[in-house]
Design a protein with these regions (language model features):
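Polar low-complexity intrinsically disordered regions
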Residues: 1-5, 48, 197
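Nucleotide-sugar donor-binding and catalytic loop/hinge architecture
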Residues: 17-26, 183-202
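Active-site and donor-binding regions of nucleotide-sugar-utilizing enzymes
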Residues: 29-183
Length: 202
């Protein structure tokens, strides 16, 4: 696979290219902090683009992100690096929805948009307890959380209760990587079963 070559300053060019999009074109945005992000986005991106026929933007900090060479006409991809161009991207974002698997929104240099009312969605990149691997308050500033299971929902609601936080919308989404493996395993078992039946018949 041949990746586009980015040189110094290209992240700012990519940011300007993104900022020229209409509000309709930039309505749904995914942000990938690293290569692992796509493991958690894949199912949702497929649902949005292939089943719901929606257009999305995919913004990444990874130079060799495979999505930068995607042939899917419903996906516009942008590389913004992980420096000041990324900081500006978040501060000036104009989108209806931003989906990411990076925690600590508003805790450090990654902030909510100062110019537009964006709805922020967090997707877990682990099945473990919220308290076992995330900093305190790591997901407090998101509007919607895609939870792996009931344990995440219970932990988040308890945290909101204890710290008197604004309730977030919680959706039981599952775990992308595991769900993909389960689907692949089910397909393999069906193929294996058919192969065995053919052997018996012959």
């Amino acid at each position: 696979m041949k990746f586009p070559k980015f040189s110094l300053g290209d992240n700012w060019k990519e940011l300007r290219r993104f900022e020229k999009l209409s509000e309709h074109e930039s309505a749904i945005v995914f942000y990938a902090e690293n290569k692992a992000s796509m493991n958690h986005f894949k199912t949702l991106i497929f649902e949005l683009t292939e089943k719901m026929n929606l257009e999305i933007c995919y913004v990444t900090s990874v130079k060799d992100d495979p999505m930068l060479t995607s042939q899917n006409l419903k996906i516009q991809s942008f590389y913004i690096g992980d420096g000041t161009a990324r900081t500006k991207f978040f501060l000036t974002l104009k989108a209806r929805i931003l989906i990411m698997d990076m925690p600590d929104l508003e805790k450090f240099h990654i902030k909510r948009s100062k110019v537009f009312h964006v709805h922020y969605i967090y997707i877990f990149h682990s099945m473990f307890s919220v308290h076992s691997y995330l900093r305190e308050g790591a997901i407090d500033n998101y509007d919607t959380i895609f939870c792996v299971g009931e344990h995440h929902k219970n932990e988040i609601r308890e945290t909101e209760k204890v710290y008197k936080l604004k309730p977030k919308k919680l959706i039981e989404y599952g775990f992308g990587r595991l769900d993909t493996l389960l689907v692949q395993n089910e397909k393999f078992q069906k193929i294996d079963k058919k192969s065995n039946e053919l052997i018996i018949i012959s």
